[in-house]
Amino acid sequence: MSIIPSFFGGRRSNVFDPFSLDVWDPFKDFPLVTSSASEFGKETAAFVNTHIDWKETPQAHVFKADLPGLKKEEVKVELEEGKVLQISGERNKEKEEKNDKWHRVERSSGKFLRRFRLPENAKVDEVKAAMANGVVTVTVPKVEIKKPEVKAIDISG
């Protein structure tokens, strides 16, 4: 059982991970000044703060993001300078018709952008992305580490 997740919002992450580009926001828990700004923050917070899991297997680095309601055309997966994986997207608000009467608006809208610095063992030319059931999965294969060849030397004498 780890203490770190309870201190940092229950997320499974390593605060000492040199590859993460997440930025700590010291003001994220402060209430916003105006109530209208507060409502805007509540409306977009769930989507804008998209959490992404990153696990490393013996063969690859695997990133997974839950993006319910988005189509694959609304999501971008890009590599910057062959070193930084960028996952972004946007969900627009539903258009309001003149005669519509809304009783509740709970689905979030807005943009999100997450960036991850890839480690040296990433095969950036073989990155694959797929989307199924609102989950984007990005697989970055790892370079196979070859074990050094060991040659036995006969001892004379």
Curated annotation (Swiss-Prot):
Pfam families: HSP20
CDD domains: ACD_ScHsp26_like (cd06472)
Family classification: Belongs to the small heat shock protein (HSP20) family.
Coiled coil: none
Keywords: Cytoplasm, Stress response
Organism of this sequence: Daucus carota (Wild carrot)
Subunit structure: Forms oligomeric structures.
Protein's recorded name: 17.8 kDa class I heat shock protein
Residues in sHSP domain copies: 43-157
The keyword Glycosyltransferase belongs to this UniProt entry's keyword annotation: no
Subcellular location: Cytoplasm
A GO cellular component entry from the record: cytoplasm
Major location category of this protein: cytoplasm
